[in-house]
Swiss-Prot record:
Keyword NADP: no
InterPro entries: Cro/C1-type_HTH, Lambda_DNA-bd_dom_sf, MBF1_N
Disruption phenotype: Plants are deficient in basal thermotolerance.
Annotated DNA-binding residue span(s): 102-121
Subunit (UniProt): Binds to TPS5.
SMART domains tied to this protein: HTH_XRE
Species name: Arabidopsis thaliana (Mouse-ear cress)
Name the UniProt record assigns to this protein: Multiprotein-bridging factor 1c
């Protein structure tokens, strides 16, 4: 039978040294391992985790923090902007021209029917992503120059 390798076949007789795998961090936290390290004089650092195991939300820097005292001192109510009347009327008009129900529109823009109802009733806080989806499906401008 011919060999796949041209020339003489040689053996690899160099020794292969197998090492034990490094200890995992879980094993290093074991009290036995910590006590053994202390007996050998190795420096051991122990750190207690802060709020470990609790279900508290961390403070995010992305969301602005509103001081409740400042809110109480303000005379103006902190109300969010709602959908303008002309926008909600354009949504209703364009939807009815296409002979779509609110559920059909909601299904096409991948939103709940309640979202479409809120936009048409003027109760929704304008979301650019939702308005863009509605513009695409209805074929009407709802942002900027409305109705064109």
């Amino acid at each position: 039978m011919p060999s796949r390798y041209p020339g003489a076949v040689t053996q690899d007789w160099e020794p292969v040294v197998l090492h034990k795998s490094k200890q995992k961090s879980q094993d290093l936290r074991d009290p036995k391992a910590v006590n053994a390290a202390l007996r050998n004089g190795v420096a051991v650092q122990t750190v207690k985790k802060f709020d470990a195991g609790s279900n508290k939300k961390g403070k995010s820097t992305a969301v602005p923090v509103i001081n409740t005292k400042k809110l109480e001192e303000e005379t103006e109510p902190a109300a969010m902007d709602r959908v303008k009347a002309e926008v909600r009327l354009m949504i209703q008009k364009a939807r009815l021209e296409k002979k779509m129900s609110q559920a059909d529109l909601a299904k096409q823009i991948n939103e709940r029917t309640q979202v479409v109802q809120e936009y048409e009733n003027g109760k929704a806080v304008p979301n650019q992503a939702v308005l863009a989806k509605m513009e695409k499906v209805l074929g009407v401008k709802l942002r900027g120059k409305i109705g064109k």
